[in-house]
Regions:
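Phosphate-binding glycine-rich loop
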Residues: 1-12
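A short helix-loop-beta submotif of the ANL/AMP-binding
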Residues: 30-34
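Conserved coil-to-alpha-helix start sites within the AMP-binding
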Residues: 20-22
Length: 207
């Protein structure tokens, strides 16, 4: 919806790489000019420094900045303070800021509380990860009223099917079960990391 509503051919956008593959596809569909921010190698794993992101925003002055947090497949995250610096830098030049929180609440930090204060911010979420409902193809956006009204202008007549809508409605009654599942996934990740360490192998932190 953000690409369809806000991006025209020739508009500049900033994307991280590697990241969710469909962002590159959307960029090509709508004719956007992409400035890639490639992760660099560091002692602690893949790294994308906040100052580099902010400086690129100021230099390129893109129509939109799109950053998953956590990113995939790197599993990297921006801290709460660093992410706010990026959002503010985008706001200073009038850029739309799209933060993809598809993995929430597997990663608890969220930028949703900023949506009323940061008029340029859109947060995307999905039922495909923690909720385990990837086959339903259901997600949602959170933004302030002005941005929501803009996005509604490009709202398709047929969004999701009745079966998917009803399934999500039922799923929402099982939030406690979902959170228990999240705890098991996180515990399993720690178990796997410890097992690798016992085998003499190193693993980087991933969210």
């Amino acid at each position: 919806a953000c690409f369809e509503s806000c991006i025209q051919s020739g508009d500049r956008i900033i994307l991280s790489r590697p990241s969710f593959a469909m962002y590159e596809v959307y960029s090509k569909v709508y004719g956007a000019k992409v400035t890639w921010l490639d992760y660099e190698k560091s002692e602690n794993g893949p790294l994308l420094e906040v100052d580099r992101v902010v400086n690129t925003i100021k230099k390129i002055r893109p129509k939109m900045v799109c950053l998953p947090n956590p990113d995939s497949p790197s599993g990297t995250v921006f801290s709460y303070l660093d992410l706010r610096k990026i959002v503010d830098a985008a706001a200073d030049i009038g850029s739309l800021m799209l933060i993809d929180e598809a993995y929430h609440p597997l990663y608890k930090d969220t930028s949703v509380p900023w949506i009323h204060e940061c008029k340029n911010l859109v947060v995307a979420r999905s039922f495909s990860k923690a909720w385990g409902a990837a086959g339903l193809r259901v997600g949602y956006l959170l933004a302030n009223k002005e941005l929501t009204a803009l996005l509604h202008k490009q709202r398709p007549m047929y969004e999701i099917g009745n079966v998917s809508a009803k399934a999500i409605e039922i799923l929402l009654d099982y939030e406690k079960d979902m959170m228990q599942s999240v705890k098991r996934v996180i515990a399993g990740k720690k178990y796997f990391q410890n097992a690798m360490k016992d085998l003499g192998m190193h693993s980087y932190d991933s969210h």
